């Protein structure tokens, strides 16, 4: 009795299958050279590749694509070759690591730094916290090139309402701009013509009618809003919900 041969997958594993990315990159099969680029980037920053991180995910997908005959061992994605696969670390109060492929965020995590300091005054503690407006502005650095969609608009609306303490959305506020951008983008096919998060969130803190430090409850509310309005029921890596979550974690380490 002959052993049944394993079936080949009918389609390659694409970036959009494993990462929350959009546009041209989402439809591209993950190629072996792409995975090597991310492995190199992670090794340069961490000294090794991250278990379960973007590089590991990409390597697994690339191996599957080779076995399926969709790519060759030396294939690379032109878009990734042009824009690169990089790892960036930002935010002085913590190590916030953001990983990019082809200019889009594929992973982000935060490691708060241990700080041993003398007791601070209440005013000094308040000044060291991150506000909702500042967290929204931080999204420009991690996902500024992302076209605004309904999940972004919902997350921004939730953030603005929590900052103001009311359910009223200001006509000229950040949330109204985000909703307008999402509605516009829904009618546009090409990403380069869509309104991006950077267009909406640059200077967000100054556009809010009120602002305050981000709490865990704020972050959870924004995460819930973003997930509910995403067809995949997930948040965008480095997006609005992720930024609020990072800010809340950092604020919890400040003794106010």
From Swiss-Prot:
InterPro entries, A to Z: LEA_SMP, LEA_SMP_dom
Stated name of the protein: Late embryogenesis abundant protein 32
Region span, Disordered: 1-20
Keyword Cytoplasm (UniProt): yes
Bias type Basic and acidic residues, positions: 1-14
Tissue: Embryo specific, only in dry mature seeds. Expressed at low levels.
Record key words, sorted: Cytoplasm, Nucleus, Repeat
Compartments in which it is found: Cytoplasm; Nucleus
Domain SMP intervals: 13-66, 130-187, 195-253
Membership in a protein family: Belongs to the LEA type SMP family.
């Amino acid at each position: 009795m002959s052993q049944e041969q394993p079936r080949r997958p009918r389609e390659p594993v694409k970036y959009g299958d494993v990462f929350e990315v959009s546009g041209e990159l989402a439809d591209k099969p993950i190629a072996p050279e792409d995975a090597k680029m991310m492995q190199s980037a992670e090794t340069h920053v961490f000294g090794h590749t991250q278990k379960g991180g973007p590089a590991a995910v990409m390597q697994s997908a690339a191996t599957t694509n080779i076995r399926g005959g969709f790519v060759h061992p030396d294939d690379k994605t032109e878009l990734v070759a042009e824009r690169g696969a990089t790892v960036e670390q930002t935010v002085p109060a913590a190590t916030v690591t953001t990983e990019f492929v082809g200019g889009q965020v594929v992973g982000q995590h935060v490691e708060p730094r241990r700080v041993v300091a003398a007791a601070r005054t209440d005013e000094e503690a308040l000044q060291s916290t991150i506000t909702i407006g500042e967290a929204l502005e931080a999204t420009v650095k991690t996902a500024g090139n992302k076209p605004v969609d309904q999940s972004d608009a919902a997350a921004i609306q939730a953030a603005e309402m929590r900052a103001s303490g009311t359910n009223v959305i200001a006509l000229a506020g950040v949330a109204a701009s985000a909703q307008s951008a999402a509605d516009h983008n829904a009618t546009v096919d090409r990403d380069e013509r869509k309104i991006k998060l950077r267009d909406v969130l640059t200077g967000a803190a100054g556009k809010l009618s009120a602002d305050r430090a981000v709490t865990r409850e704020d972050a959870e509310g924004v995460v819930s809003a973003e997930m509910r309005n995403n067809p995949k029921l997930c948040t965008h890596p480095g997006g609005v919900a992720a930024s609020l979550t990072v800010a809340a974690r950092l604020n919890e380490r400040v003794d106010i």
